[in-house]
């Protein structure tokens, strides 16, 4: 019988049901091969003819789900994303939750629904864990994202020029690559809780609508966890800090130094707080009482006047001392204050964003009041201020070495503005106003993106300038306490050897004991030609490349705006020169190190 005859004698086949078609569309080549054999055997004798069972079952219809990613520098974006994930799951929506440090950037092309919560660091750069994805989306190999629905929540600090820049960049680039917004982007300031909760509520409602359209079976309803502000094991946290005691405050720069750097030791006894090398300590502080008096005098406000702050009725002097930000100016403050001052010059400053940003960066709040006097009520003035926020300091000790203590390396911020002495809020509190045995409220902020290698035999290269050396003291303390076999190399820079060599005797002892195997120091002002850590990196190119071939992990800590960028440029030069790669290959190599967690940065 000819093929033509066979076609004519067989009755027409009915169309497959839609649900079967949907299942078949998800099969891979191996599954199709198995299924065709199985079907042929069943058609021939109603049995499988001894075909081996396929381990992979036919795929079920893909449930409605959403991927929630976070890119965090200090933990805020992570906590918001965790809370959003909990709310989505409580609404019956399946969630895939990941921090970007654990997410393969190329997987973005396979996502269908994506929520991203990201902070911004430095001069508008994405957090460290988001760098690889950011580069992919903005590079030549950026994937099409026309099947993606997304929403972005940006966290930032409006006192900086590039407010929420990372969130804006991701949001814009997703759209340019074809993705569709589930919600308009939200940019949240330091007091982000209300904005984040609003964004979460709207995205949950929107995704419930989308799930209904897809007729997906929702996941079981769950009860959202209570007390998200509290650590899971009940330890002290940002919202409930531990009242610790100051043990020591020692200046570790010379009297002639232009810098005032303090070694701070704090007692954690009784807190059950634990930290790892790479973590930060959050420090709550009180403003300078002299600054509070100065501001109230300038405004003509009685210190006993009562206002609402922190859910309480307090004298305005007490409220300004402990509840409001007084040392960091913001564009919002200047714009809000300008109508009260009724001054043409201040109005012009407030109206020009570029001029305003420069003014905010250079002019403290108190000096705005000096230059542009105004009369406000206590409530009006407080309404212009941001809530006081804790400061984070890299921990410079290992608990394996110091037990129930935690050590910090704090650069005291001091400057003059129009002849008036000014100081940083937290650094001034720690360096000048907190007395020995005095109480400081603290909490541990985890930094899982800045960790020693799990294999202690791996070599490490530590690159830092100024107080950026802090976590490396903790790293080497930890390696010494473990008697780790891995080699340690420190590249450190500061202005002067004799004045600014932080922890000099300790590094010498580590070298003597065999826990500091290589060291290079860049003293930028000790000779006519300035020498920086990036110069030492290029100088040691062959050695660095050799260590990388041995599996070394590279760590960078310090200033994001200048030092970290210069160091990265130097590392790329090393990879190009000693590694014999072109520029594109060097970039890809560095991205590979990032994804392998062998290139980690803690920059600010």
UniProtKB/Swiss-Prot annotation:
Molecular functions (GO terms): flavin adenine dinucleotide binding; FMN binding; sulfite reductase (NADPH) activity
Key words of the record: Amino-acid biosynthesis, Cysteine biosynthesis, Electron transport, FAD, Flavoprotein, FMN, NADP, Oxidoreductase, Transport
UniProt binding sites for FMN: 72-77, 119-122, 155-164
Signal peptide (UniProt feature, chain positions): none
Chain residue ranges for the region called Disordered: 212-231
Metabolic or biological pathway: Sulfur metabolism; hydrogen sulfide biosynthesis; hydrogen sulfide from sulfite (NADPH route): step 1/1
Database matches in HAMAP family: CysJ (MF_01541)
Binding site for FAD: 327, 361, 391-394, 409-411, 424-427, 604
Occurrences of domain Flavodoxin-like (ranges): 66-204
Cofactor(s) listed in the protein's UniProt record: FAD; FMN
Gene Ontology process terms (BP): cysteine biosynthetic process; hydrogen sulfide biosynthetic process; sulfate assimilation
Native source organism of the sequence: Neisseria meningitidis serogroup C / serotype 2a (strain ATCC 700532 / DSM 15464 / FAM18)
Residue ranges of domain FAD-binding FR-type in the record: 239-453
Organismal lineage: Bacteria, Pseudomonadati, Pseudomonadota, Betaproteobacteria, Neisseriales
Chain's gene name: cysJ
Cofactor binding comment, as recorded: Binds 1 FAD per subunit.
Name under which the protein is recorded: Sulfite reductase [NADPH] flavoprotein alpha-component
This enzyme's EC code(s): 1.8.1.2
Family matches, as Pfam families: FAD_binding_1, Flavodoxin_1, NAD_binding_1
Function: Component of the sulfite reductase complex that catalyzes the 6-electron reduction of sulfite to sulfide. This is one of several activities required for the biosynthesis of L-cysteine from sulfate. The flavoprotein component catalyzes the electron flow from NADPH -> FAD -> FMN to the hemoprotein component.
One Gene Ontology cellular component: cytosol
Ranges of compositional bias, category Low complexity: 216-231
Catalytic activity: hydrogen sulfide + 3 NADP(+) + 3 H2O = sulfite + 3 NADPH + 4 H(+)
Family annotation (SUPFAM superfamilies): Ferredoxin reductase-like, C-terminal NADP-linked domain (SSF52343), Flavoproteins (SSF52218), Riboflavin synthase domain-like (SSF63380)
Assembly and oligomerization: Alpha(8)-beta(8). The alpha component is a flavoprotein, the beta component is a hemoprotein.
Positions contributing to NADP(+) binding: 524-525, 530-534, 566
Family per similarity comment: Belongs to the NADPH-dependent sulphite reductase flavoprotein subunit CysJ family.
